Amino acid sequence: MRYNSPVLVIHGGAGSWRNMERDRALKALRESLERGYGEFRAGSSLEAVVEAIASMEDSGIFNAGRGSVKNSEGGVEMDAGLMYGKTLSVGSVGSIRARNPIRRAYEVLKQGRHVLMVRTVWEDIEMGDNSRDGNTVGAVALDEQGNLSAGTSTGGIRGKLPGRVGDSPVPGAGFYATTRVAVSCTGIGELILRLLPAKEIDMLRAMGYPLDESVRAVMGKFTETFGRDNLGLIALDYQGYASASFNTGAMPRGIKWNGGEKVFFDEVDQL
């Protein structure tokens, strides 16, 4: 469906969500949309993505920021990545501990010297309840100047080995943004890193395929290759078309545009 810019799309992670309260997740999504969308007044799509994700990191509801799951040694290591489509600027962090990993990724992007920094930040933070089935968070945005941005943040896989880095801070895998499209993914990082669904959607869009068709094709290929219960994604293109898909039990998500707002939980292929 096509929306009037500026547009902000977010997700709270694809997964089973068996132990999660639906109402709390949707409330956190609405707060994220409000906080992120406010950035359009003075900032670009990049700032909208950062603030929307930071809001979800702060909530403690999702597997990101305060809600991050623990690794096999009982510690917390977080990953996040951010990309600005107009300049292909990227900032990513891996295996860090911070209240807002997406802000750390934003710092890397603004500095412009490197793309991915690992194990550079260890903040003391008050963690939330990470016993739920919350998952990776992400956002994509289109501002009134036509610029696209994408970002993703996660605490990784519960019980992972220390030092494990998933797809979330890797451009083309957990997130990607160009002048054509912005994508944020969620799911099993070890699989996403092998197929690079975010990059594949951009390639199909560059070949002239509509966004919905591109998303369905990539989701179909991923599911055919690796089975189900492993991927969800949101996508937004330069024309304001938005799309979402997942092959898991649910993927809380929402969209806010110049004219309205919607949130979803387990409704398949709706945005």
Range-by-range predicted roles:
Residues 1-271:
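Alpha/propeptide regions of enzymes that mature by internal proteolysis
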